[in-house]
Amino acid sequence: GPSHCFLPIGVGGLAAGIVAPVWQHMGANLGKMIGVESYMSACFLESIDAQTPSLVDISEETLMAGLSCGEISDLAWQILQPSLDHCLSITDDAIAPLMAGFADGVFGGGRIEAGECSTAGLTALVAAKKDPALWEKLEFGPTSVVLLIGTEGATDPGLYDQLVTEGRQK
């Protein structure tokens, strides 16, 4: 199985829905589970600091609309709080270039029509690779196997085309 799994967190339902059965099936063999949020709506990180589900005031929207929630669900909190090994917040800076990379098939496995939220895990992975201290903290090594969860395709075809075009120029 994967040594690392990057899970996008909005209200936490999808991440909890993945973690719970994987934990049941794999138990102690479960790899590192890493939550990923937009820094503009990092309600899980805020909840970790407060040690209780907390509301985040969203003053600016992220391109990753599906992650722009501002509040973790109580049920997701009960599952994710003890299950996630790490949680990272990301900016929107890499979204367009990574969407273009998926669209052009540069990551292997062919072309993928990946929407904005689908880049969250890869955005966090790339950021970790650029930060040696974070890379070490996340315990990556030469035999690491990473699972990235993509959550949507081109839900807004016009925005998708715009971001892929912008991403190809970066």
Identify the function of each model-found stretch.
Residues 1-82, 136-170:
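Glycine-rich phosphate/pyrophosphate-binding loop at beta-loop-alpha junctions
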Residues 72-141:
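Active-site-adjacent helical/loop segments in soluble small-molecule enzymes
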